[in-house]
Amino acid sequence: MTYKDYTGLDRTELLSKVRHMMSDKRFNHVLGVERAAIELAERYGYDKEKAGLAALLHDYAKELSDDEFLRLIDKYQPDPDLKKWGNNIWHGLVGIYKIQEDLAIKDQDILAAIAKHTVGSAQMSTLDKIVYVADYIEHNRDFPGVEEARELAKVDLNKAVAYETARTVAFLASKAQPIYPKTIETYNAYIPYLD
């Protein structure tokens, strides 16, 4: 299948829509995640088109206003606790509704991978893990530990998920930031892979 089979748009048309939703820096990141996701899909025997599309759309809603996110929460996921978290959580979990509104994506695997890319899940599909890890390791990323994450991603996707999640939890804790409950669940489910 191609991107057009999932969206009704070919890659060029889709890139135009995605580009319109974000800054140049974010768009370059998205292209890097798409590339990393396709590479991971090839390595782990997953559908490259599906992985590439999920990656291309993973930050589609990242630069929406808080008011737009609150509208989407009220319309699709009326959860008062969700409202307290903000964009870092919303753009995945709630952003899928904007993607459905704008692009009519119906594939539940793609939507789930986009929803989970910010917080993970105790149960992640191969596609979920690909997008989650690709977002962390794409070639534009430059931070302590990213090279180790890239190497882990080449040998074991579960170890890469565990490493990324452990680093994220440690970073948030070091900044005295709240940690989304699903992220803690992801950590607890995957940390045994690092033993």
From Swiss-Prot:
UniProt-recorded name of the protein: Bis(5'-nucleosyl)-tetraphosphatase, symmetrical
SUPFAM superfamilies: HD-domain/PDEase-like
InterPro entries hit by this protein: Diverse_Catalytic_Enzymes (IPR051094), HD/PDEase_dom (IPR003607), HD_domain (IPR006674), YqeK (IPR005249)
MF terms (GO), sorted A to Z: hydrolase activity; metal ion binding; nucleotide binding
Domain HD: 26-140
Origin: domain of life: Bacteria
Lineage of source species: Bacteria, Bacillati, Bacillota, Bacilli, Lactobacillales
Organism: Streptococcus agalactiae serotype V (strain ATCC BAA-611 / 2603 V/R)
CDD domains named in the record: HDc (cd00077)
SMART domains: HDc
Catalytic activity annotation: P(1),P(4)-bis(5'-adenosyl) tetraphosphate + H2O = 2 ADP + 2 H(+)
